[in-house]
Amino acid sequence: MKRILSALFAFTFLFGVVPAEASASDGEGFVFEPDPGLIDMTKTRKTSDITIRDPFVLVFGQKYFMYGTGAAAGPGYGCYVSEDLENWAGPVNVFTAPDGFDGNGCYWAPECHYYNGNFYLFATYLSRSTMRRGVSVFRSQSPLGPFEEITGGHITPFDWDSIDGTLYIDGDGQPWMVFVHEWTSTVDNIGTMAAAKLNGDFTAFIGDPVELFKADDPVWLNGKVTDGPFLYKTKNGRLLMLWSNFNSQGYCVARSFSRNGEITGGWYHGVAPLYAKNGFFDLEGGHAMLFTDLDGRLLMCMHSPNKSSETVHETAVFLEVVDTGNSLELAQIRQLGLFKRLAIAFSDFLREAADRFRSWIRDIV
């Protein structure tokens, strides 16, 4: 009942409340020209032709750099480069696992962040020595690498399965890594979102990670997954997190909000997804991030669908997002008008509530 009341409160608060964006583009003052021996910018592929999961876009030097699961040739991490978000050169390997590297597969979800003059790759791999997935940090002087691991193995706890690390800089300038503690290594098999302070050179955590929330905290989600965290501050200074789980229609993008604007300040959850398969969108999708394009538009990048089939394959999707000051809305949805938006959100809420009620009945009968 407590979760249902919290959900109803969040629903009334949904259209006008809630959180924030990522870092602005760096390298504005010059044009980054990739080495033609490394990548041929004249040979491109359309976004829709590229199979990729967990896409992450860095804007630097008037170029877009798209990293993601499946972009590398062989063990490691890869990147595509574009000038218009439609035609992509590459991919090029930004990190290739050398002989003796501890990785044993699961080269997932690389994110590239420009910080204090260096490029940092936060990325997941499966460790040969621990047989756990974890997040490591890699550093380079170029967004195209080569990147070198600087953490001496996973930075996340060795006895956890951890994935999808992302960077957040708080109001005091303190860097944090927010990451997934996978359901595969939690006591109750429910995934959690975790965070830890980073030291100045991103080589280690300062203190132990803290749990932020669990996958089943939002009443409308029925999965045990916490995927793809991304932090954003709205124009009014509200701290928001995008992340992914499953509702009754499949993979989707959730919004959660800090109660006091701090990472560890406690989190509450919107009762409707930012993106989900519904009467407006035909395909599921998730593992989202935000960036500002070269025209100043706030865009959400995610992969959709969540699983390839004979007719569709996983690819990067870019959707314009509106920062309402307290929350985020998809521009396509916002154009529908308030009443239609409320109708879609309420329909989603009722469908998920009915699905939860049916599950509850099955459990007690």
Can you annotate each of these PLM segments?
Residues I364-V365:
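Short, solvent-exposed mixed-charge patches
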Residues L14-A22:
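C-terminal segment of classical bacterial N-terminal signal peptides
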Residues K2-A10:
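Sec-dependent signal peptide recognition
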Residues M1-K2, L350:
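Structural motif marking the loop-to-transmembrane transition
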Residues A24-A354, R358-I361:
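Carbohydrate-active catalytic/glycan-binding domains of CAZyme proteins
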